[in-house]
Design a protein with these regions (language model features):
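A short glycine-rich, hydrophobically flanked beta-strand micro-motif that places a catalytic Asp/Glu
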Residues: 256-267
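Short hydrophobic alpha-helical segments enriched in small aliphatic residues
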Residues: 8-10, 19, 30
Length: 301
């Protein structure tokens, strides 16, 4: 896509993400644990680059060495410990080390990633705090939830699994009290959102303050969900520049270094529906793109 962005977004993109070529990455997929341990031992004999370090398999297709995660900080040889704490940036450190490194004042990429991964409650709170357009949403705990929800939302409305759901599997259209009662039996807290009658939404992927891909997700007949995993159709036609500008605004304001944003236009206004830190790859495959190579290229420039 060759959409032009505002000068404000361009300046923000240029200033918010720097990835020097001399990158030392720290990562270990569980299925490669033994191999990575051998790599760690052998590299201790070499000079360790000190500018950047990473943990994530997101760069497994790059030429950058990915070493892996140890269960204990003390498991790292002292030379690797020194390289980590002196790094300019630590990439894809995983949920545990991400919080530890940030608490220690180290710079982590991607920011605001693991805490918001699959956490719709935290995402909604962030959008509301930053006054980002988001469908009216409320969280309900405790007793008498059905009565309180019915007093706040007219039927139909949307109910979601607040934590961990993906690919549309935890999204429900609540049409009547019986639907709501069934939802409440298995969900506490209840995540309730106003229903916007849409035939599509726009998935926009932003990495390192760069827009890397965007496509429409159009729902199949008889389903209110636009998710590709639920039968939605991908289209690259007529994507408005204003929608892309809005997505960039959301990513920059929320400090999301890697995110797949679901954007919609309703009643002449753009809304962010959800932030996906793990997002489907079908839209990339349809365009002949490799997300892992895209990320590797971002770090090599």
């Amino acid at each position: 896509m060759n959409q032009e962005f505002s000068d404000e977004h361009r300046r923000a993109a240029e200033g918010s993400f720097h990835a020097p070529a001399s990158i030392f990455f720290l990562y270990m997929d569980e299925c490669m644990r033994t191999f990575a341990i051998l790599e760690l031992e052998s590299m201790c004999m070499e000079k360790i680059p000190s500018r950047l370090i990473s943990l994530g398999k997101r760069l497994r297709k790059s030429s950058i060495r990915c070493l892996g995660v140890k269960p204990n900080w003390s498991d790292y040889p002292e030379e690797l410990q020194r390289a980590i704490v002196s790094a300019e940036k630590i990439c894809y450190p995983g949920p545990v080390y991400s919080e530890i490194f940030e608490a220690a004042g180290l710079s982590v990429f991607p920011r605001n990633y693991y805490h918001f991964l699959g956490n719709k409650v935290a995402q909604t709170d962030l959008f509301n705090l930053l006054e980002i357009s988001h469908p009216r949403t409320k969280i309900y705990y405790g007793r008498d939830r059905l009565k309180r929800i019915e007093s706040d939302f007219p039927y139909p409305f949307i109910a979601k699994t607040p934590l961990g759901s993906s690919q549309g599997s935890g999204v429900f259209l609540i049409r009547r009290p019986e639907d709501l009662s069934q939802y409440l039996e298995t969900h506490n807290p209840a995540y309730i959102q106003e229903y916007l009658a849409l035939d599509r939404d726009l998935r926009v992927v932003v990495i390192g303050a760069r827009l890397v891909h965007a496509y429409w997700r159009i729902h199949r007949e008889g389903d209110f969900r636009n998710n590709i995993a639920q039968g939605g159709i991908i289209s690259f036609e007529n994507i408005p520049a204003a929608a892309l500008d809005f997505a960039m605004h959301v990513a920059l304001k929320c400090r999301f270094d890697e995110v797949g944003l679901d954007i919609c236009e309703y009643a002449g206004k753009y809304f962010v529906l959800e932030a996906n830190m793990v997002y489907g790859q079908e839209g990339f495959r349809k365009k002949g793109l490799d997300i892992h190579q895209i990320i590797a290229d971002l770090f090599s420039t």
